[in-house]
Amino acid sequence: MIKFDLTNRVAIVTGGAQGFGLAITERFIEAGAKVVIWDIDEDAAKKALDKVNSENLSYQIVDVSNFEIINKNLIEVESKHGKIDIFINNAGIAGMNTTVAEYPIEEWNKVINLNLNSVFYC
């Protein structure tokens, strides 16, 4: 495996409490980064903290489909850690498994807000 050094780098990983996001979080911690998980699932975030068990890992409960919440939390991360060096925009959802004709508009808006708008917001 290629080794890389992220000592004293600050990273935010959206959706960082599970799946690919957690794998990225773990690798960044191993490389020396300070990582802040942004996730909407507090239980999963707490489990990630317990699993990784590093003083360089913290989390914030952030709905990345909400521009105001993103800005508030960015300010908090910057005030605690300084400059943000790495931002991994990993949060996303698959939505429902149904036809377009049967797809509820509320669900469509939720998927678009999280998978598309949040990328622009972040």
What residue spans do the PLM features occupy?
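Canonical Rossmann dinucleotide-binding motif of NAD(H)/NADP(H)-dependent dehydrogenases/reductases
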Residues: 4-35
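Conserved glycine-rich Rossmann-like NAD(P)H-binding loop of the short-chain dehydrogenase/reductase
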Residues: 33-47
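The beta1-alpha1 cofactor-binding region of Rossmann-like NAD(H)/NADP(H)-dependent oxidoreductases
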Residues: 42-43, 61-74, 105
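Conserved catalytic-site loops of classical short-chain dehydrogenases/reductases
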Residues: 85-86, 109
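Conserved NAD(P)H cofactor-binding loop of Rossmann-fold oxidoreductase domains
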Residues: 91-96
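Substrate-binding pocket helix/loop in short-chain dehydrogenase/reductase
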Residues: 98-100, 107-109
